[in-house]
Amino acid sequence: MGDNNQATTGFDPAANAPDAAAWDKGKGKATDPTQDMRMDDDESDESEAEEMIDDDDDEDNDTLEPISSDNIISGGRRTRGKTIDFQAAAESLKDDGMDEDDDEDDDYVGAGDDDEDNKMQD
């Protein structure tokens, strides 16, 4: 009875996968890229020098003119804060002869319609 004891190994998904060859394909665990730290230091020095050059350019382009008061819209053309009475607007449309059914296009015959009913209307 004691002869069949086997030690269990840890969880190995590659060994337990139904298609063990597919384990290497697709998304896998991310690995940390190894980089030389000396190269990173050089890059940071270069980027700091570029930032200082960019700051000098901003000061040269700071020649904006002030805003002219002629471009400011004044008067009653704005609708912010204005109360709109939608019932009165609907009543004025009815008074003008505009009904809700006027915009329906039941009698429209399109260019691609080849029904017999549409041919009779022509």
From Swiss-Prot:
Q: Tell me the InterPro entries matching this sequence.
A: Histone_chaperone_domain_CHZ
Disordered: annotated segments? 1-122
Compositionally biased tracts (Basic and acidic residues) = 22-38
Q: So which residues are the signal peptide here?
A: none
Q: Which UniProt keywords apply?
A: Chaperone, Nucleus
The Acidic residues compositionally biased stretches are: 39-63, 97-122
Chain segments annotated as coiled-coil in the UniProt record: none
Instruction: Look up keyword Chaperone and say if it applies.
Output: yes
Question: Which Pfam families does the protein's record reference?
Answer: CHZ
Residue spans with biased composition (Low complexity)? 12-21
The membrane spanning regions, by residue number, are none
Name the principal localization, coarsely classed: nucleus
Similarity-based family: Belongs to the CHZ1 family.
What function does this protein fulfil? Forms a chaperone-bound H2A.Z-H2B complex that acts as a source for SWR1 complex-dependent H2A to H2A.Z histone replacement in chromatin.
Q: What is this protein called?
A: Histone H2A.Z-specific chaperone chz1
